[in-house]
From Swiss-Prot:
The RNAP catalytic core consists of 2 alpha, 1 beta, 1 beta' and 1 omega subunit. When a sigma factor is associated with the core the holoenzyme is formed, which can initiate transcription. It comes from the Bacteria. One of its GO terms (molecular function) is DNA binding. It catalyses: RNA(n) + a ribonucleoside 5'-triphosphate = RNA(n+1) + diphosphate. Its EC number is 2.7.7.6. Pfam families: RNA_pol_Rpb6 (PF01192). This is DNA-directed RNA polymerase subunit omega. GO terms for cellular component: cytosolic DNA-directed RNA polymerase complex.
Amino acid sequence: MKEVNIDTLISKIPNKYVLTVVISKRARQLFEELKFLKTIARDPLILAMEEIAQEKIAYGEGDDLED
């Protein structure tokens, strides 16, 4: 597993506060999915950061950040 660089994440989502919310929201989604499958092998927070770095998920202006 390659370490996720914060500069890479900031280049994808420039606002550090929005980045934090996007990462935490995605990590919660992953945790719920993995908990349901009972296969939590890796930290959902790391998985969320990797997904953003690899551009598997993205945030755009106007996206809903509320739960």
